[in-house]
Amino acid sequence: MNLYLDIGNTNLKFGYEIENQFHFYTLPTLENYTCDMLSKNLESFIKKQKFNYLIVSSVVPSLNLVIKDFASIHLKSKVMFIDKIKKEILNLNGREHSSIGSDIIANALYVSSRYEDAIVISLGTATVIFHVVSKRLEGAIIAPGVKNSYLSLIQSAKKLSEVILKLPRKNLGGNTQEAISLGILKGNFHLINGFINELDPKGKSKILITGGNYGMLKDVLKDYEYVDNMVILGLKDYYEIFK
């Protein structure tokens, strides 16, 4: 059995699979983690499970050494980072894998083995949109994340206070809460749909949504398929390729 880890800018997401059922645990991303701290925080999740490998996608390089030590000292397992890719499995269009976020590569691996033509919208710290056609990663778009856009607005505008985001059934807000909800929720909906229409004007691509901020936009993105923890699933695919 393996342990999978998605190191994002906001959260660390751990997952392992028993009898085709994934179990997940989330910790906040902190740069002062030690391997002992991780072990203590994960004690109730890991219990007495034995792992052969810790498979990692990381966009926070400063944590990589700690993760290696954690795997070696506490898990007694080998560690595998996304550090190579086979062109026949996922064509990066001439780019080095190091120039592309490993979370994007993990998601693209998941997609490339299941769909001929797919657009993925990953709603995390950033909103990332990328297109995979015939196992080729065409490229990506990175925009401010939904939650960060909202928090940035509230923090930078002195007269605005935090509100509950709820989409009104009209095109113009009648008060500050409605106006902010429209700007953040419908604004991100139009941003996403605008890029989808540019990338896939004929509507032939499979559209997939993933990421922790999906809950904020699920009411406006309900026409698209949601895949929970796509990075973890992509890490499982990565292990199967390179084990």
UniProtKB/Swiss-Prot annotation:
Q: Where in the cell is it found?
A: Cytoplasm
Q: Name one GO biological process term.
A: coenzyme A biosynthetic process
Which residues constitute the catalytic centre?
103 (proton acceptor)
A Pfam family: Pan_kinase
Q: Which GO terms describe its cellular component?
A: cytoplasm
Instruction: List the catalysed reactions.
Output: (R)-pantothenate + ATP = (R)-4'-phosphopantothenate + ADP + H(+)
| UniProt GO molecular function | ATP binding; pantothenate kinase activity
The pathway that the record names for this protein is: Cofactor biosynthesis; coenzyme A biosynthesis; CoA from (R)-pantothenate: step 1/5
The UniProt record gives the binding positions of ATP as 6-13, 125
Please tell me where substrate binds in this chain: 101-104, 176
InterPro entries associated with the record: ATPase_NBD, Type_III_PanK
* CDD domains given in the database record: ASKHA_NBD_PanK-III (cd24015)
Q: Which domain of life is it from?
A: Bacteria
Keyword Metal-binding applies: no
Q: What top-level class of enzyme does the UniProt entry assign?
A: transferase
The UniProt note on the cofactor reads as follows: A monovalent cation. Ammonium or potassium.
Q: Which UniProt keywords apply?
A: ATP-binding, Coenzyme A biosynthesis, Cytoplasm, Kinase, Nucleotide-binding, Potassium, Transferase
Main location class: cytoplasm
What EC number is given for this enzyme? Answer: 2.7.1.33
Assembly and binders: Homodimer.
Q: What family does the Swiss-Prot or TrEMBL record give for this protein?
A: Belongs to the type III pantothenate kinase family.
Biological role: Catalyzes the phosphorylation of pantothenate (Pan), the first step in CoA biosynthesis.
PANTHER family tied to this protein: TYPE III PANTOTHENATE KINASE (PTHR34265:SF1)
> What protein name applies here?
Type III pantothenate kinase
Primary gene name: coaX
